[in-house]
Amino acid sequence: MGNELRHRTVLLDEAVESLVTRPDGVYVDGTFGRGGHSRAVLARLASAGRLIAFDKDPRAIETAQGIEDARFSIVHDSFASMRDALAARGVEKVSGVLLDLGVSSPQVDDPARGFSFRADGPLDMRMDPTRGESAAEWLARASVQELTEVIRDYGEERFAFQIAKALVARRAESDRLGPLDTTGELAQIVGHVVKTREKGKDPATRTFQAIRIHVNQELADLQVVLDAALSLLEQGGRLVVISFHSLEDRIVKRFMQAHASAPAVDRRLPIRAVDLPSPPLKIISRQFPSEAEVAANPRARSAVMRIAERVTP
């Protein structure tokens, strides 16, 4: 219960107000978490409205199953499965899709989940601990090159190569020291390599982010769900995405811009602008948490919300 109480949904009112344009529509919450956005959406829906939520985390599913509302259903899967999951439920078009990306406070705050370097725990990092390869299992087999690429590309860590070498060197000592399987030891290894310090940021922050993104295929799944959302949105439907770091936000920004712009055509070709297909999206706005929200919930500081609307059938 403590974790449930500590979780604060970021940009709650702003997201739901931007999302729900038709109270009798069908909406998707791609990241149920602990249900903050879902409950607020349900409060705005009419009796004919419908909300379908997704989450990989078994604990989120347990929370969702406690919502007794005929308009609500939960899917225990990644939002990357959205297109097929909705088709299986007879849903062809939706009035809005909400994505609240990243890891939730209850996941970070529970040492047993292995997301945080602040308290020692098993090196897991999976959103769904029942599926796929854990962080410890991946670290036990990844090459220096693969480690470097993941830590560099997903963590934007300039010491990626040095960290990768240190991790492989530690693996060579597994017969004597045992496997690298705790968050505390991983943070310690990274801390010994990263000599410079960013103000207010633990030296392991970027590496933990990178490994978590890789283990959960977060950026690949994000691209899949953005494409799915575009195809599922009815005319006038909204796509609302809240991201918490530059890698996510860059993907969302480029996706929305690409689909809100007319196709590029060589000016030498005899094609009139009026003959080109209209872009499917219109960018509505970009919003940030208020100073008051950041003061009450420091984890909201890095959040950015982007909103786009489908303008073509």
Curated annotation (Swiss-Prot):
Encoding gene, per UniProt annotation: rsmH
Name of the protein in question: Ribosomal RNA small subunit methyltransferase H
Enzyme class: transferase
One GO BP: rRNA base methylation
EC number from the UniProt entry: 2.1.1.199
An annotated Gene Ontology molecular function: rRNA (cytosine-N4-)-methyltransferase activity
InterPro entries found in the cross-reference section: RsmH, SAM-dep_MeTrfase_MraW_recog, SAM-dependent_MTases_sf
Chief location category: cytoplasm
Role description: Specifically methylates the N4 position of cytidine in position 1402 (C1402) of 16S rRNA.
UniProt cross-references to Gene3D superfamilies, sorted A to Z: Putative methyltransferase TM0872, insert domain, Vaccinia Virus protein VP39
Taxonomic source organism: Burkholderia cenocepacia (strain HI2424)
One Gene Ontology term, aspect cellular component: cytoplasm
Subcellular location: Cytoplasm
Keywords, in A-Z order: Cytoplasm, Methyltransferase, rRNA processing, S-adenosyl-L-methionine, Transferase
Pfam families: Methyltransf_5 (PF01795)
Superkingdom classification of source: Bacteria
Binding site for S-adenosyl-L-methionine: 35-37, 55, 79, 100, 107
HAMAP family, alphabetized: 16SrRNA_methyltr_H (MF_01007)
Protein family (similarity comment): Belongs to the methyltransferase superfamily. RsmH family.
NCBIfam families given in the database record: 16S rRNA (cytosine(1402)-N(4))-methyltransferase RsmH
SS bond list: none
Catalysed reactions, as listed in the record: cytidine(1402) in 16S rRNA + S-adenosyl-L-methionine = N(4)-methylcytidine(1402) in 16S rRNA + S-adenosyl-L-homocysteine + H(+)
